[in-house]
Design a protein with these regions (language model features):
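Conserved PLP-anchoring active-site segment centered on the Schiff-base-forming lysine
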Residues: 101-117
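Active-site PLP attachment segment
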Residues: 212-250, 256-267
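Conserved N-terminal alpha-helix of the aminotransferase class I/II PLP-enzyme fold
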Residues: 46-89
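PLP-dependent enzyme catalytic core of the Aspartate aminotransferase-like
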Residues: 349-481
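Active-site phosphate-binding strand-loop segment of PLP-dependent enzymes
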Residues: 139-200
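Conserved small-domain helix->loop->beta segment predominantly found in fold-type I
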Residues: 282-359, 383-403
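Conserved beta-loop-alpha segment that forms the PLP phosphate-binding cup at the N-terminus of a helix
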Residues: 81-104, 120
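N-terminal "arm"/small-domain region of PLP-dependent enzymes with the aminotransferase-like
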Residues: 1-64
Length: 481
């Protein structure tokens, strides 16, 4: 197929060039009705912010340019079908899981999953079996699930309705999935992979393999995370014979907006085009990787920080992700480092107790040199600050192989109450506790609360982490059943 084509974007552009007069929604009327002080920022994009006009197709019943754009994406990724998502990978996870899982179905789930996976399991009233990721204490980060642990769970629960994996994790760390997928398929179990951070993996080595290349049945990717797509723009890929496509499409129609953003969908068309052009230029990919490697090397040479990576041979890192760790005696935590970098207008993806995570661009046209100078300046200033917090107090993340203490169905029938932290140990959590980003719950709804949970939550609060948990959590309280 001709991957240089951009059917949806081209059609939108042609519509704009005809200088149309809008008597349809949205109410800004191609940008004519808009607050004057904001117009300069929004005017260009509002010109193509239209609705399902003749020739512009319909996301929920595509037959024209949207269908063509999705077909080009499917061709690029080598899958049966690709769907454009306008509600992020969240809706991809929800629709994928609901399409294969029903009430009381057993589902094998990687524990360090996004909250949207857990919301889908709750909506389905499923029975999740959680597999804990391994933890690398040398760099203080989870490195994915052990293949043998997942295969053991499949053999223990051969009638499971799905295996749900997260690969890569938020830090860009991946593991080989083919062994898991092959065993799951031998048991007629579909595999769903949340590959939100890996839309670019089909570029090939040195990037990790994409789950679409290892046979996963449903693969969800946030195009907006690493490709040049607008926020919330994502892809859902389908392949194999285990998926009921009619059921999947029902949930996509039910869960996504009936008024999808045309600029957002056009950006997915353009992101696919960008990736296809890059994939066809191996020399350009090599040059890009060399630039990223050089940036990391120079970053690692800045006093006060170091670039860290897992050393195990069985994991592979995404070249677009960089974990930096504070090493100066006056820089105690990742949160402290993140705040200081922001003083020089360097904005990172996330901080945790140990690291700051940077997401690098899929382009050499980026102010790498200017960024290095700003980071150096921020580090010079932070070296003269003081903090009394001892990072060694932080215990490892409290993941473990587990099932829920009570089922989702039972939760609907039980009353919630709020108790102080000290009274919560041994009780069942009635609300999740979620550091955000990355959106991975420390404590699951329905999980038995332990002292390790509370210690970790308390440490994060002391460090000033952003945690989704409601007002009760701010008052050192938890909701329990």
């Amino acid at each position: 197929m001709d991957q240089s084509q951009t059917p949806l974007f081209t059609k939108l552009q042609a519509h704009y060039l005809r200088k149309p007069i809008s008597f349809h929604v949205p109410g800004h009327k191609n940008g004519r009705v808009f607050p004057e002080k904001l117009g300069s920022l929004f005017s260009a994009i509002l010109n193509i912010d239209v609705t399902e006009l003749r020739g512009l197709d319909d996301l929920h019943d595509p037959e024209g340019v949207i269908a063509e754009s999705q077909y080009l994406a499917a061709n690029l990724y080598g899958v049966n079908k690709t769907y454009f998502l306008v509600n992020g990978s969240t809706v991809g996870n929800l629709a994928s899981i609901l399409s294969v899982v029903s009430q009381d179905d057993i589902v094998i789930v990687q524990r360090d999953c996004h909250k949207s996976v857990l919301n889908a399991l709750k909506m389905a009233n499923a029975r999740p079996i959680f597999i804990a990721p391994e933890y690398d204490g040398n760099v203080n980060v989870c490195t994915g699930v052990n293949q043998e642990d997942v295969i053991k769970a499949i053999k223990q629960y051969p009638y499971a309705k799905a295996v749900i994996l997260t690969n890569p994790n938020y830090y860009g760390i991946t593991r080989e999935l083919k062994g898991i997928i092959d065993v799951a398929h031998d048991h007629q179990i579909p595999v769903i992979v949340d590959e939100a951070h890996g839309a670019h993996f089909i570029l090939g080595d040195p990037f990790p393999k994409s789950a679409v290349q290892t046979g996963a049945d449903l693969v969800i990717q946030s195009a907006h995370k690493t490709l040049p797509a607008m926020t919330m723009g994502s892809y859902l890929h389908v392949q194999g014979t285990f998926i009921n496509v009619d059921r999947l499409e029902f949930y996509l129609r039910a869960l996504q907006s009936s008024s999808p953003s045309y600029p957002l969908m056009a950006s997915l068309d353009l992101a696919r085009f960008y990736l296809a052009q890059l994939k066809s230029e191996k020399i350009q990919v090599r040059s890009l990787v060399q630039s990223l490697t050089q940036f990391k090397k120079r970053l690692n040479g800045i006093e006060g920080i170091k670039v860290v990576s897992p050393m195990e041979s069985y994991v592979k890192e995404d070249p677009l992700k960089v974990m930096i760790e504070p090493v100066h005696s006056c820089i105690k935590t990742g949160y402290n480092l993140q705040k200081q970098l922001e003083s020089q207008q360097i904005y990172s993806e996330l901080a945790d107790p140990f690291h700051v995570l940077l997401v690098l661009p899929l382009s050499e046209q980026f102010p790498f040199e200017q960024s290095l100078q700003k980071i150096k300046k921020a580090l010079v200033e932070i070296i003269n600050t003081e903090t009394s917090f001892d990072i060694n107090q932080i215990c490892p993340f409290p993941f473990q192989n587990t099932t829920l203490a009570i089922s989702y169905e039972e939760m609907h029938l039980l009353k919630k109450r709020t108790v102080p932290f000290e009274e919560a140990i041994g009780k069942v959590a009635a609300s999740p506790v979620i550091p955000y980003p990355p959106g991975i719950p420390i404590l699951l709804e329905g999980e038995l609360i332990t002292k390790r949970h509370l210690d970790y939550i308390s440490h994060l609060q002391e460090l000033g982490a952003k945690i989704q948990g409601g007002q009760a959590l701010s008052n050192q309280q938890l909701e329990v059943f």
